[in-house]
């Protein structure tokens, strides 16, 4: 099976590294953080990134409003997976199992 990630995951990781870099107090810490961020970017070069396209947006907006407590980003990830008929791998089965038509499994625990 092919492995994919989503543009939403890329966004979350990028925001996380940006926040980490902004918190750095010393030049040494910044060098380390930038190097780790660069490694993360290189990792994305080896994997297909699924877009939040019009089909995913439609799927996202079709979810019941009761699911909003799961979180916008997680619901966007779920919408991308649903729109591609993809299996979502996550440890967060409690929330993702509530999403209609989403195939989700935890392969880690």
Model-predicted regions and their roles:
Residues 83:
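Flexible glycine/serine/alanine-rich "lid" or loop that lines and gates the nucleotide-sugar donor pocket
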Residues 91:
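Conserved acidic donor-binding loop of glycosyltransferase catalytic domains
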């Amino acid at each position: 099976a092919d492995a994919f990630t989503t543009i939403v995951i890329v966004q979350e990781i990028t925001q996380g590294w940006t926040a980490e870099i902004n918190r750095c107090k010393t030049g040494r810490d910044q060098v380390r953080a930038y190097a780790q961020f660069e490694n993360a970017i290189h990792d994305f070069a080896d994997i297909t990134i699924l877009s939040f396209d019009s089909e995913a947006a439609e799927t996202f907006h079709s979810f019941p409003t009761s699911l909003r407590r799961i979180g916008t980003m997680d619901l966007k990830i779920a919408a991308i997976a649903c729109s591609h008929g993809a299996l979502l791998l996550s440890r967060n089965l409690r929330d993702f199992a509530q999403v209609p038509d989403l195939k989700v499994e935890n392969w880690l625990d």
